[in-house]
Structures are given as structure tokens and as C-alpha cells.
Amino acid sequence: HPAGLFWLHPHLHGSVARQVALGLAAPLIIRGGLDAVPDVSAAREHVLVLQDFELDRLGRPIDPGMGALMGGREGTLVTVSGQTQPRYAIEQDGLLRLRLLNASASRFYRLSLEGHSMHIIATDGGSLAVPQQVDELLLAPGERRDVLILGSRAGGVFRLMNLPYNRGSAGMMGGTLGSRTAFEIASVVYEGRAASPRQVPQ
């Protein structure tokens, strides 16, 4: 099996979107390929499973109805691997590898890290021959990306932002779909300096 980040989710006909919207999804990592590249293997690695939920007043997930699923419901609570706004450590002159999975049923994520570029090294189609440097990336439901972040700053805390994204019209249901405001989903904090300076492999 090819190496990379994959994911598990239900395949019960007629119930997939509902179960994914309620959080039934998990990452699956197959090792190999890029994992043997020295700078990649030396990077601090985290898997970020992005999900959104709608909760009732007691904090319980609301079971989405057919109308909400057809309308592309976006939950008001966004979690990252089950946490809200987690922090990830990066070393100065080190590398951070974020393995991103959009496990939301409808929400698109348009991600940007303050003060840093991201270097895409793999997609859900496999590893890239040459890393692609971007200032933001878009993840549709089910999409995956592996990115490297170089610890190029002297220190500080930098927010991983989800930027507004217009998914288009809801058709006969009216309205515009997608996030209209930017918000923080996680942050990167500098802790120490790498014993050996790292570079994004080319």
C-alpha cells in the first residue's frame, strides 16, 4: 500500500454524511516514502483532524437532519484532533510537520499560519516530487495535506487561522454557504532551538 495519510469513516449507504457530521472519522497513517528523508524524519510531527459540530445547550452534539446535511451545515464548534485551539511546539531552525485531515462533512478549511509559509510535501494523491511553498491552503471535506513549517522566527506564538471561504449559493434554500469570518483553530509556539539546523528538502 502506498505511504501517506488516509482516513477511516463509515460507508453505510444513506448515513455517511450524518455519521461523519457527528464525528465518526479517524486518521490512518501508512509509513514509508517521505518518512525516510532525514529532514522530514527529524521534524516534530502532529496529525490535525479538523472537525466541526453543532451542540445543544448541554454541550451534546446535535444530530443533523436531512435539511442541514443537504444545506451543507457548518458547526459552530471546530475541533482539532478533539481539542479546541491546541498549541504545537516548534524549535527555532527546526521543522514542524503537520498532517492535516479535513474530517468535516461540509466545511472547507482555508488555512494560513501567521508569519510563516507552509511547504506542501504530500496530498491525498501521494507525496510531491518537489515541495510546494504556499501562504495558505484549501482543504475540502475528505482532503489531506502534509506540510512542513520551518522555524524561521526568533520566537513567539503564531496563530493557525481559518480564513473566510465562500462555497457558493445554497440554491433554492437561499443564502451563501461557507465561513464569513476568520478564526484561530490552533497555534504554533517557539520552544528552544534545534540542535542541528534543518531545511525543507528539495
What is the role of each PLM region?
Residues H1-L148, S187-Q202:
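Histidine-centered copper-binding motifs that mark active-site loops
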Residues G14-A17, R153-E191:
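Terminal connector regions
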